[in-house]
């Protein structure tokens, strides 16, 4: 839909207003998207994790990341399987739907939407470890939860959280600005039922991960960044 079509659609909405009847009018914004991975995709990423752990010259990603956690290992998306089968179509449709909102891309007016996965890694975290507030490089980023050793209800009943008016133990949290310019947080509570779920979001959207407690298990998650394909820029020259 062109900008002109947007204006016409907006005028039509005004013309349809009924006298004396109030209705909500949501300000434009963009969503984040979520899904549950099919079993073949889950099996694929577990296999890639095993391969990364077995590598004698495994590539630690810790020096490139803000996480205060046990380990982050680079993963290999063999034959671009995960990107092509799980991410590509959805991500490119997202960028096409929200072209000027997804990134700081200076060429967004040229409708470039071809993407590739620039980075792909697995995170292993133990109790008391955390990821501070940060964003990512790229256009879109994603997180997949593979193993969650705690339940948020139990974590929020721990002494450090029980009497708080904002219990956060084990939470994942996004930060964004509301219509007043105030910073708001959107919490994603961690529970084993979320194992296998994926969230995709603009890379510049800030987020953090709080520590969990009273469990000796690992929290295992996968992250990755999607960028515009450099070949698309080359074709423009």
Predicted regions and their residues:
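Short, charged beta-turn/beta-strand-edge "cap" motif at the junction between a beta-strand
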Residues: 205-208
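Residue-level marker of positions within ordered structural domains that often coincide
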Residues: 50, 147, 201, 214, ...
């Amino acid at each position: 839909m062109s900008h002109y079509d947007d204006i016409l659609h907006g005028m039509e909405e005004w013309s349809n207003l009924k006298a004396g009847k109030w209705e909500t009018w949501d300000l434009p914004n963009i969503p984040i998207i979520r899904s549950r991975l099919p079993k073949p995709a889950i099996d694929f990423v577990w296999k890639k994790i095993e391969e990364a752990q077995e590598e004698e010259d495994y590539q630690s990603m810790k020096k490139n990341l803000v996480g205060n956690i046990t380990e982050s290992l680079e993963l290999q998306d063999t034959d671009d399987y995960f990107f092509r089968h799980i991410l590509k179509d959805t991500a490119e449709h997202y960028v096409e739907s929200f072209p000027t909102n997804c990134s700081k891309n200076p060429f967004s007016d040229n409708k470039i939407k071809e993407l590739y996965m620039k980075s792909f890694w697995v995170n292993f975290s133990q109790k008391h470890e955390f990821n501070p507030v940060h964003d990512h490089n790229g256009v879109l980023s994603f997180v997949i939860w593979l193993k969650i050793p705690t339940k948020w209800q139990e974590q929020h009943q721990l002494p450090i959280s029980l009497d708080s008016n904002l219990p956060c133990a084990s939470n994942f949290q996004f930060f964004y600005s509301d219509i007043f310019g105030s910073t708001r947080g959107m919490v994603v509570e961690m529970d084993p039922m979320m194992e296998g779920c994926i969230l995709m979001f603009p890379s510049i959207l800030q987020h953090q991960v709080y520590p969990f407690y009273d469990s000796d298990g690992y929290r295992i998650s996968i992250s990755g960044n999607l960028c515009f394909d450099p070949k698309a820029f080359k074709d423009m020259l």
